[in-house]
């Protein structure tokens, strides 16, 4: 009898683990769709501009509009839906995403396309914020960062596979075909989430409690860790194409292949960053941020050599996304009584870091600071160095909280 009971318990545990894994893959598919729609416009700017009769710079504002939609939508959507069960919220977000991309595919003019991009962007921060909470609740406590990393793998795969395939599709059959493809992927993700993601009870916290948590200094520091720790990546990465072409001497046509190397790096970094964060959160975060700082600083030198540049771009990818699971897990730990809004705001902080980093790099180039473009990578390392200082502060606050 004891053997039968143990066998049944083992079967149930295996079934539970399988269900959790499938649920994580469902979240990954949703993340893939959202990541694809975020980045795809970069590869289709000429086609969009020509079809809608606007300039390339004006078409480029579709990227800015999406980023602003993410930053604004993250807190607004989460606050407005705080009483909604988390699975229902995910499905609601996917419906908005599907509608936004279908509208983009049908857009008769630039204005409608911009509105469609913003509508799709409103779902971004909340999906990754709520998805992080659900992913963390699907697994034992010691595996939470790894679960978050699995979900974010969808975002990294969108860079490696989704964007190149979507760009090819758009160039071959028109940019609207790409948005129709993303709409279909979103619909499939919706069905998969319905079938595989279990109903997860919403936190018992009220809106007042959710907002109250945001008054904590530890939450502010966690957000600043994300803004500056990740912002340095985009100080350099935003201008990676001119660095590769104008400084290293690669041909413009080779840039896309080099970016695939970066994409492989961020996938590896995301997975192993999650594993390391589950073992030792702050030591791993500080170690990866230190690696990121060193790699960025050296990039100003290695950019003069093609072989060294390839190695640098790959390691940069590993270090860049190696921080993501740990930064997200730290926010969940810091605001564990009301994680949904805090987690979502941390996604907005990643995007704020992207915008801040791009702005800093642009200022360096525009002003010709220390030679302009060649100085961008080492200036980026100073941004991540600030992130390290905030991470040390965050570690100190966590120790103080543990003692109290």
Residue ranges and their predicted role:
Residues 72-111:
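Conserved MFS/SLC helix-loop-helix module at the cytosolic interface between two early adjacent transmembrane helices
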Residues 96-103, 111-120, 307-315:
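Paired small-residue
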Residues 53, 85, 106-112, 249, ...:
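Helix-breaking motifs and short loop linkers at transmembrane-helix boundaries and internal kinks
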Residues 283-327:
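C-terminal transmembrane helical hairpin of 12-TM major facilitator-type secondary transporters
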Residues 171-183, 363-384:
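A membrane-interface helix-boundary motif in multi-pass transporters
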Residues 116-154:
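Cytoplasmic helix-loop-helix junction between adjacent transmembrane helices
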Residues 74-85, 269-281, 365:
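Helix-to-loop junctions at the C-terminal end of transmembrane segments
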Residues 108, 112, 140-195, 239, ...:
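Helix-loop-helix hairpin linking two adjacent transmembrane segments in secondary transporters
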């Amino acid at each position: 009898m004891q053997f039968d009971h143990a066998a049944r318990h083992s079967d149930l545990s295996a079934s539970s683990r399988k269900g959790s894994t499938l649920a994580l893959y469902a979240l990954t598919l949703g993340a893939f769709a959202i990541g694809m729609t975020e980045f795809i416009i970069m590869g289709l700017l000429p086609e969009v501009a020509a079809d809608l009769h606007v300039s390339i710079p004006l078409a480029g504002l579709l990227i800015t509009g999406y980023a602003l939609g993410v930053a604004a939508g993250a807190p607004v959507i989460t606050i407005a839906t705080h009483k909604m069960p988390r699975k229902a919220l995910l499905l609601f977000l996917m419906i908005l995403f599907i509608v936004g991309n279908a509208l983009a595919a049908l857009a008769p003019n630039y204005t409608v396309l911009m509105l469609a991009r913003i509508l799709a962007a409103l779902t971004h921060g909340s999906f990754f914020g709520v998805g992080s909470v659900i992913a963390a609740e699907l697994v034992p406590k010691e595996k939470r960062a790894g679960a978050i990393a699995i979900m974010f793998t969808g975002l990294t795969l969108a860079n490696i596979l989704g964007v190149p395939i979507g760009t090819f599709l758009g160039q071959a059959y028109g940019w609207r075909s790409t948005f129709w493809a993303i709409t279909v992927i979103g619909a499939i993700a919706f069905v998969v989430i319905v079938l595989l993601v279990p109903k997860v009870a919403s936190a018992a916290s009220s809106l007042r409690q959710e907002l109250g948590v945001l008054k904590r200094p530890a939450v502010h520091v966690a957000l600043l860790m994300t803004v500056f720790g990740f912002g340095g990546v985009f100080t350099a990465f935003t201008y990676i194409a001119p660095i590769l072409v104008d400084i290293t001497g690669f041909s413009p046509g080779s840039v896309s292949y080099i970016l695939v190397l970066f994409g492989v790096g961020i996938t590896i970094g995301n997975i192993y960053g999650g594993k390391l964060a589950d073992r030792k959160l702050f030591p791993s975060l500080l170690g990866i941020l230190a690696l990121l700082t060193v790699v960025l600083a050296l990039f100003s030198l290695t950019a003069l050599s093609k072989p060294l540049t390839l190695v640098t771009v790959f390691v940069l990818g590993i270090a860049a996304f190696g921080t993501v699971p740990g930064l997200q897990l730290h926010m969940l730990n810091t605001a564990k009584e009301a994680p949904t809004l805090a987690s979502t705001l941390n996604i907005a902080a990643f995007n704020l870091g992207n915008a801040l980093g791009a702005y800093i790099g642009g200022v360096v180039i525009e002003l010709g600071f220390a030679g302009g473009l060649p100085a961008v990578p080492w200036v980026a390392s100073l941004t991540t160095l600030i992130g390290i200082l905030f991470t040390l502060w965050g570690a100190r606050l966590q120790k103080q909280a543990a003692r109290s």
